[in-house]
Amino acid sequence: MVQSLHEFLEENINYLKENGLYNEIDTIEGANGPEIKINGKSYINLSSNNYLGLATNEDLKSAAKAAIDTHGVGAGAVRTINGTLDLHDELEETLAKFKGTEAAIAYQSGFNCNMAAISAVMNKNDAILSDELNHASIIDGCRLSKAKIIRVNHSDMDDLRAKAKEAVESGQYNKVMYITDGVFSMDGDVAKLPEIVEIAEEFGLLTYVDDAHGSGVMGKGAGTVKHFGLQDKIDFQIGTLSKAIGVVGGYVAGTKELIDWLKAQSRPFLFSTSLAPGDTKAITEAVKKLMASTELHDKLWDNAQYLKNGLSKLGYDTGESETPITPVIIGEEKTTQEFSKRLKDEGVYVKSIVFPTVPRGTGRVRNMPTAAHTKDMLDEAIAAYEKVGKEMNLI
């Protein structure tokens, strides 16, 4: 007899709960800033992607309100019919300047970017070399393309060179692409882009960097590709507009030829209503801020180093992070979730990250310090880590 939907859901939800893999979803009352309120209680927030504090920036709010007054609350259509507003053109021109490319295209989410761009260029006659720790949206985008997917050991340049050589010399594929995150979100390490470019040039690979956690953070704000000075060497620069930029959406930056192709062939662009006017104008304002000043970027890095130093002095394992992302690696899944709950009891909101997001036995809480945190907030968080860590015999 076939299984009912109820039986399937009950069995699998119970499994997740019994194995410490089920995450409860909290509702925030108000804005997602450095401090948040849940069920009437205030917490120091170390779990958002709001790196620069722009999600609550007054200038961005004013820009969004003004755009709503002039352009309405929605774009009204897909981009290819009559949903391309002058605001969208302004945004894409600004993004191209920001990333140092000829052109850019905006999408409704960062996830959409990878679903759109990969499948618009790669197909069943091609191969994609993909870092094993790439984001889920890259994995799904690769699957959608129907290209041969070849997993590459994480940031292992010897493995990349060997697999690139094998794929190219096999003669089986029309195109071969290498895809990597710019900054890996669970550990905070940075892709080895100079070595990747060298290998790509040796074997004629297309290069694709998803800089979701690098845009606004690396390269004085312009991203990981800019950090290494490789803007003219990377074919696809992908980024979100919801993390450091503080709003919503995503983009692809590259040559005009590439962007023209994506506007003609990428399905999320063709079949989904464009970004809302208020969001679009707020994003443009955010990007212009990053181009005009590094103040927020510098404050972010200062706060990140302060938190890392404090946690390391307590004896916590913060991994090999090269960015503001600061994991505290606990290990066992249930212990990790209990640790997160105990920190919450102490007024620090930092979510546990466990399998399948990270490998079994490497559960961690991931701290995301921002430019909006004060040193007093970070001191309070460090004190909570000390108290809970000692109570649980973790330090």
Curated annotation (Swiss-Prot):
Disulfide bonds: none annotated. Substrate binds at H135, T357. InterPro entries: Aminotrans_II_pyridoxalP_BS (IPR001917), Aminotransferase_I/II_large (IPR004839), AON_synthase_class-II (IPR050087), AONS_Archaea/Firmicutes (IPR010962), PyrdxlP-dep_Trfase (IPR015424), PyrdxlP-dep_Trfase_major (IPR015421), PyrdxlP-dep_Trfase_small (IPR015422). Its cofactor is pyridoxal 5'-phosphate. One of its GO terms (molecular function) is transferase activity. One of its GO terms (biological process) is biosynthetic process. Pyridoxal 5'-phosphate binds at G110, F111, S185, D210, D211, A212, H213, T240, L241, S242, K243. The keyword rRNA processing does not apply. Its EC number is 2.3.1.-. NCBIfam families: gly_Cac_T_rel, PRK06939.1. Belongs to the class-II pyridoxal-phosphate-dependent aminotransferase family. This is Putative pyridoxal phosphate-dependent acyltransferase. The lineage of its organism: Bacteria, Bacillati, Bacillota, Bacilli, Bacillales.
